[in-house]
Amino acid sequence: MSLQVCVMTPERIFWNGQSEEIILPTNTGEMGVLKNHAPIITGLDVGAMLIRTEKGWTSVAIMGGFGIVGQNRVILLVNEAESADTINAEQAESDFNSAKEKLEQAQSTKQRVEANTQFKRAKARYQVVKNLSKA
């Protein structure tokens, strides 16, 4: 293994271990991190994060935060995190479709902002469940 990865929420250490690669949802798009990555601090967006270990890929829904990369260590401070095994697949799909519909029907700026936030959260959870079914 080449990266030490720690994912922390305000309540607890969510995931801590060795990884070959991670893919993060940042505020400017997805970012992959491999061994010997250049030091960086980045904002994390709401989305699905992928962690590759020797056992395969793990998908985690994160709800924004910050990431610090340096010296083959990755520290992620996230608002919330959910793993695929804690998400009900049918509920995630239903929430995603409902949030998508709300976003399409939003009229005012306030409604669009609120609907977009709900949509991004629902999409992250749904992507995590879909990634699990592909594994």
UniProtKB/Swiss-Prot annotation:
Annotated compartments: Plastid, Chloroplast thylakoid membrane
Cystine pairs: none
Gene name in the database record: atpE
Domain of life of the native organism: Eukaryota
Principal cellular location given in the protein's record: plastid
Pfam families membership: ATP-synt_DE (PF00401), ATP-synt_DE_N (PF02823)
Family from the record: Belongs to the ATPase epsilon chain family.
Function, as annotated: Produces ATP from ADP in the presence of a proton gradient across the membrane.
Listed name of the protein: ATP synthase epsilon chain, chloroplastic
Subunit structure: F-type ATPases have 2 components, CF(1) - the catalytic core - and CF(0) - the membrane proton channel. CF(1) has five subunits: alpha(3), beta(3), gamma(1), delta(1), epsilon(1). CF(0) has three main subunits: a, b and c.
Membrane topology of this protein: Peripheral membrane protein
